[in-house]
Amino acid sequence: MNDLAYHLNEQICSVNPIVFEMLSSLGKRIYFPSKGILSQSAEAHKLAKNFNATIGTAMEGTTAMNLPCVMDNLPGISPNEALLYAPSYGLKPLRDAWKAKILHDNPSLKDVPFSTPVVTCGLTHALSLVGDLFVDPGDTVLMPDLCWDNYLLNFQDRLQANLEFFPFFDGERMNVKGFEERLMHMLPGEKILAVLNFPNNPTGYTPGEKEGQALADALLAAAERGVRVVALVDDAYFGLFYAQDSMRESLFCKLAGKSRNLLAIKADAATKECYVWGLRVGFLSYSIGGADTADSPLYTALEAKTAGQIRAVISNCSALSQRVVTKALTNEGFYEQRHRCEEIMRTRYDRTRKTLDEHPEYRRFFTAYPFNSGYFMCIRFNDLRADEVRRHLLDKYGAGGIAMGERDFRLAFSSLDEEEIAPLFQTIYQACLDLSV
C-alpha cells in the first residue's frame, strides 16, 4: 500500500475507524497523489517566477494557447477559464457555491458538519465513485425494485455486488416496512450500501415527511445494532416537488452526523438542478457521526480518496462546465430563474395528473403508480406487455416511452409541452385498444 494511502487511512481511523471498515479494498488503497506531478506543479505555480515547465499545457505568455474557432464560441469566458485543467477535486469556487446551495435548499443542515462537495463528471460518475470506494464483489447493495437501470449496470455488473430489492410501493404509499425488513436481515459487523433516490426514477415518487423519517429511523436502527451502513442518497431530481405532503429537503438531512455506524453520502448534480444536462457536473458530499467539523481529518481523507479515484480514471472534470455552473450559481438571478423552470415542470405534472383523473376508462388497460415529483411517472399495464405497447406506439403512432420489465412503462412528462400530455395518454389508450382486439 502506498504511504499516502496509509496516511489517509490513519486520518480516517483517528476520527472513526468504522469508516475504514466500510471502504472497499480499492477504497483503502486509493489516495490522491499529493507528492507527484500535481503537487510539484502547484508549488511551481506559486514559486516559479521565471520559468515554469511543469504542467502539460501549451501557453503563450500567461494565456492558454487557443484556436479562435474554439474561443469564438465562448464569449465572456477567457481562454484560461475555458481551457486549462481543473483540479481533481473540482474548482474550489464551485465546491463552495454548491455547498452554499445545499444549505440554502436544506436549512436543517445549517449546524450539521458535512464535507465540502467533490466535483464529479455528472451524477452517474458520482454513483460510480461511491461503488469504487465502498463496494467489493459480494457486498450487499439494497435498493427498491423500481429503480434506475444504471444502478444494476454499476453495482451488479461492474462491481459484482449482491443486489437485494424491496418492493417500492405498498398500495399508494412507499413500502417502508419492506425496506426495514430487508435491513433487519443484516447482522452486526456486516456492511450494507442502501441506495435511495427521491424523487424516484422511474416512478416520480417522493415520500412524505413521516415516511422519510421512518426510512431514516430504519437505517439508524440498523446502525445502532452494529451494522455498517453506507446510505447513498441519490438526489438527481432534487427540488422538483409538486405535492404539499412530500419531503422538501433531502433524506441526507435526516441521516447526516446521526451515527458513528452510518456514513451518509449525498450524490447530486447541476444536471437537473441547473438544467444543464450535457455539462456533466455532479457532486459527492459525506457526513458521519464522530466527524464534528466540516474540516475534520476524516472528511479531508474521504475527499482526497474521491479525488484520487477521479485522478486515476478521468484525471479531472471539465473546467469549462465547472466555470459555467459556478457563474450560474453565483448569479443574483439564479433562484428566480430556477423557480420559473420549476413552475413549468409543475404545470406538466398537474396536466398529467388531471388527464388521468379525467379518464377513468384508461384503467381498463393501465394504472399509474403514485407520483408527486421529478421528471417521470410510471404506468403499469394490466394485461398487455409493456414492450409490445412500446413497439406499437412507435410503429403506428410515432410516440415513445420506456418499457421497464414485463408491465411497467415510464413516461417523461418533463420532455413534453403541456398541450402534448393529454393527447399522448389518449394515444396510449388507443394503442391498448388496438392490441386488445
What do these predicted regions represent?
Residues 81-231, 238-258, 419, 426-429:
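Conserved core of the PLP fold type I
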Residues 319, 326, 338-353, 365-380, ...:
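Conserved glycine-rich beta-strand-loop-beta hairpin in the small C-terminal domain of fold type I
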Residues 53, 98, 141, 155, ...:
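Generic structural signal for small/hydrophobic residues in well-ordered secondary structure
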